[in-house]
């Protein structure tokens, strides 16, 4: 069976009011493009799973207990069958209409296309702290990305092998992929205000975890094995 052209991975946690709307938006945005939608329910405590609209190309993965956004993304990426994998949040703040822009960047030669929120629809404090965090992170890990907090990304399937699975890796996908030698581009995308539900992240839990993770990523970058095979020689037989 021929795989789809793109796998769209969406982590979900308590998004009962958003998931059906998001599914419809993704269907409309990717109309005419063969795709699969992988929804990963991170043990939601509301009716998220029952609100998923079942149908062809829709896959629902469910965790038995809450494992976090990184775990949900990893499960979705590993389950993906397409050569291109798209990531976006389930809270409707990412605009699925931007997916084709990032997919085109992959078709044009990039290995990972990252969106950055050109006009963020968050409060002033969140924008300021995010700007500071992005600056510090970019300088420290050297990924050159202005907005790693933007979940909207499309990558070649091969990039998944560069991702070291640890809690919080989703904040450092560009750094991990770039350090493995893949080509990254960043493009402006739309950002929408949250309509339903509440943000799962606060300033405190993001700052402390991100700082610890940043040190770990820097260590991984320094310790990454870099060895390219340039030739292969057949052993000489004893009879020669």
Task: State each model region's role.
Residues 70-73, 99, 129-133, 160, ...:
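A general structural signal for well-ordered alpha-helical segments in protein cores
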Residues 1-124, 158, 182-186, 227-240:
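Structured catalytic core of nucleotide-sugar glycosyltransferases
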Residues 107-161, 178, 212-215:
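Short, flexible, basic/aromatic active-site loop/helix in glycosyltransferases
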Residues 44, 54, 65, 121, ...:
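Residue-level signature of the cytosolic catalytic core of signaling kinases
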